[in-house]
């Protein structure tokens, strides 16, 4: 009887360790021309005295011409942004803060990758790409978003690169 309990315990421990190992991801974060200031999954709200301009998404092809690329800083990103797809921007401390929201995604693991930010005549264009999960992901509804800042005040246009 004691031998059966030990075998059952070992079988349960092995089964649990195999299940938990499948949940661990060894994916490394790629860091380009930007600094990650805060990597927590928060969605901070905009105060009432800041102006927000809602704009709809536009989609472009990969063959865009890049003239003047700006540096940027990622302030926050995560899986629980706003429910509606689109972007908005506002100004704070001589910086333009840009928030890009994806629509409802059926699983975890979707990411927004910033390709580049170009400047033309006091207007910037943010080119981004939606990266789907590479492996199996948890079946949970998410609303991916990214919040970034650029030095200076600009009108903003965001375009998804496919």
UniProtKB/Swiss-Prot annotation:
Record's subcellular location: Membrane
Ubl conjugation keyword on record: no
Keyword terms, alphabetized: Membrane, Transmembrane, Transmembrane helix
Parts of the chain that traverse the membrane: 5-25
Membrane topology classification: Single-pass membrane protein
InterPro entries: PrcB_C_dom
Cystine crosslinks: none
Species lineage: Archaea, Methanobacteriati, Methanobacteriota, Methanomada group, Methanococci
Protein name, UniProt field: Uncharacterized protein MJ1373
PROSITE patterns per record: PROKAR_LIPOPROTEIN
A Gene Ontology cellular-component term: membrane
């Amino acid at each position: 009887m004691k031998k059966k309990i030990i075998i059952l315990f070992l079988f349960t421990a092995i089964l649990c360790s195999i299940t938990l190992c499948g949940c661990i991801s060894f994916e490394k974060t790629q860091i380009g021309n930007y600094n990650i200031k805060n990597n927590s999954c928060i969605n901070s709200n905009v105060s009432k005295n800041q102006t927000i301009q809602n704009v709809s998404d536009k989609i472009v092809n990969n063959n865009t011409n890049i003239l003047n690329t700006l540096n940027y800083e990622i302030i926050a990103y995560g899986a629980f942004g706003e429910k509606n797809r689109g972007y908005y921007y506002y100004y704070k401390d001589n910086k333009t803060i840009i928030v890009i929201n994806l629509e409802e995604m059926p699983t975890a693991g979707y990411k927004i990758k910033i390709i580049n930010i170009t400047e033309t005549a006091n207007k910037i264009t943010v080119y981004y790409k939606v990266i789907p999960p590479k492996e199996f992901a948890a079946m949970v509804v998410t609303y991916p978003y990214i919040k970034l800042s650029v030095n200076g005040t600009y009108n903003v246009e965001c375009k998804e690169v496919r």
